[in-house]
Regions:
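Extracytoplasmic loops/domains of multi-pass membrane proteins
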Residues: 59, 65-141
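Transmembrane alpha-helical segments that form the functional core of multipass membrane systems
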Residues: 153-262
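Short, Lys/Arg-rich, polar N-terminal cytosolic tail immediately upstream
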Residues: 1-15
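Hydrophobic alpha-helical transmembrane segments of multi-pass membrane transport/permease proteins
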Residues: 13-48, 157-167, 253-258
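Membrane-spanning alpha-helical segments of multipass transporters and channels
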Residues: 217-357
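Short extracytoplasmic/periplasmic juxtamembrane "stem" segments immediately C-terminal to an N-terminal membrane anchor
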Residues: 50-68, 341-342
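Membrane-helix interface and discontinuous TM-entry motifs in multi-pass inner-membrane proteins
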Residues: 92, 129-169
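Hydrophobic core of alpha-helical transmembrane segments in multi-pass integral membrane proteins
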Residues: 33, 191-199, 312-322
């Protein structure tokens, strides 16, 4: 035997490793391209598609505004009612024609500077056609540290990444959810991590950026709920359908969900495709909830709260069903088919449920 013998090589194994690496690199490249295409399609050329406005004006002016396809008009009786519509998040803007021949334009910078700017342009155009002088009032201005009103969007999308990755890492470290105790530990760990994540983001946005106008604990609560909703959904899907399904959900949330959140441009400026998902994906609800508690006194928070609760509850339900199924199958096979368990106690599991999450 030679003193320095070359180690045995396994060509088949080497080819498989090369193929797996190549496929992973191609998949990652396609994922990056999909993100670029999604974000550029949503944000590169914002165009007004649908804006709701409250109007208190003579009928001729109301009819003229109603004739614009991109505007949905709600008629109100007076200035106070119009202003309230905007602050209560029932409309994106409001136009009021005073007896003095002046048009007052109510906008909400806290709901997104792009939307407020678009509303101002529309209002000034209407006023010019009617021969009216126009003034603008911001009923919910953004914080001085966030004049563009986009910090909420960035906080949400990066918490999405943290919650998704955190749920995956916790799953790998703690193992599959095979019994109620493991499920309880996973849930408690996820809740604790979500609190740390929400707390860190809240402190950074408030103390370092100075982008909060107050309501610190409400913002923390909204971020914690959002992180729990995303992390819980990822965990539940992984427990019930396997790691591949959770990866697909994560990719959907990153590629479509982040763009549908409409942070930099606002929902009225999104195309129909993305605006369809805004109220469905957790990102859209997270951004809306943050803005509601920070700038609008909690107005408009009910719908995003319900949406996030549904995402979290769905993930919890999937995890519970998956755990119960595994426990029941284990009991059945150990009772009626004792020979099916090997020396390591491995048992048959239903094909739908993955042992890994």
């Amino acid at each position: 035997m030679a003193k320095h013998q070359a180690p045995d090589r396994h060509p088949v194994r080497d080819r498989a490793a090369i193929r797996t690496t190549a496929l992973a690199m191609i998949g990652l490249t396609l994922f990056v391209i999909a993100m670029i295409a999604s974000y550029s399609g949503a944000f590169a050329k914002p165009t007004l598609h649908h804006m709701s406005v409250a109007v208190a004006a003579p009928q001729q002016v109301v009819d003229g505004i109603r004739g614009q396809d991109a505007l949905a008009v709600t008629e109100v009786g007076d200035d106070a009612a119009a202003r309230a519509q905007v602050y209560e998040r029932k409309t994106d803007a409001a136009f009021v024609v005073a007896p003095t021949g002046e048009m007052k334009i109510y906008v909400a910078g806290g709901g997104g500077r792009s939307v407020a700017n678009a509303a101002e342009i529309v209002g000034r155009t209407v006023a010019a056609k009617a021969g009216l002088a126009a003034t603008v009032e911001d009923v919910a201005p953004a914080a001085a540290g966030d004049p563009s009103g986009t910090v909420e969007f960035y906080a949400i999308i990066f918490i999405s990444i943290g919650a998704s990755v955190g749920a995956t890492v916790v799953g790998r470290l703690m193992g599959a959810v095979r019994n109620p105790l493991t499920l309880a530990l996973r849930t408690a760990t996820l809740a604790g991590f979500s609190a740390v994540l929400a707390g860190a983001v809240t402190v950074y946005v408030d103390v370092i950026l100075g982008a909060l106008t107050g309501h610190t604990w409400q913002v923390f609560g909204a971020l914690w709920l959002y992180a729990m909703a995303v992390g819980g959904a990822i965990t539940g899907v992984a427990a019930a359908f396997g790691s591949f399904a959770s990866m697909v959900l994560t990719a959907f949330l990153v590629v479509i969900g982040n763009a549908a959140a409409a942070g930099p441009v606002g929902r009225p400026l999104l195309s129909g495709f993305y605006s369809t998902f805004t109220a469905i994906v957790p990102q859209g609800s997270g951004v809306s909830l943050l803005r509601s508690v920070e700038y609008f006194g909690g107005n408009g928070a009910q719908t995003p709260l319900v949406t996030l609760a549904i995402w979290g509850a769905a993930g919890c339900l999937l995890a519970i069903v998956a755990t119960a199924s595994r426990v029941n199958y284990r009991a059945i096979y150990e009772r009626f088919l004792p020979g099916s368990a090997g020396r390591d106690g491995a048992i048959l599991r239903p094909g739908l449920l993955s042992p890994a999450d």
